[in-house]
Amino acid sequence: KEGAIGLVILAVLILLVMPMFLDIFRLNLMGKYLTFAFVAIGLVLCWGHGGILSLGQGIFFGIGGYCMAMFLKLEASDMQSTAAQTTPGIPDFMDWNQITSLPGFWEPFHSFGFTLFAIIIIPILLAFIIGFAMFTRRVGDVYFSIIMQAIVAILTILIIGQQGFTGGINGITDLKTLHGWDI
């Protein structure tokens, strides 16, 4: 137990000290490594300890990331920076797809508080619904993996097919700031 506490203290110290000594490129790279480490830990818990191979754990990670990207894109799509568009104030990919107003499901993402809430709650709710449906029917072994892969395919087709609302295959790009801080 003392070893675990020591590791936590060391990790916190490293995370507090690293921003002081690393340039922005290395700091962003370290952030990406830590983010992907969380995904890997989720796979280890699911497959390594639970014995359930999930080929779709990335959808929950991706949905959380997409929620943050929606907030960042709305922040980057203010009236000044989008003045050259046909419809100023909406994300550029929506303007390119002739969408003239911000869709209703994008509106709450103007709020950073809602975005942080959505990053956690939306993937949890989706995982609960999928898990409840599959585990109450005692789906296991390879069938769990096949169903998860099918859900990934469905979401991929949905996201790419709704390019005007989601950014399609390119996703949400050109994210520059978070509350005025360069990212």
Task: Give residue spans per PLM region.
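Transmembrane alpha-helices and adjacent helix-loop boundaries
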Residues: 1-183
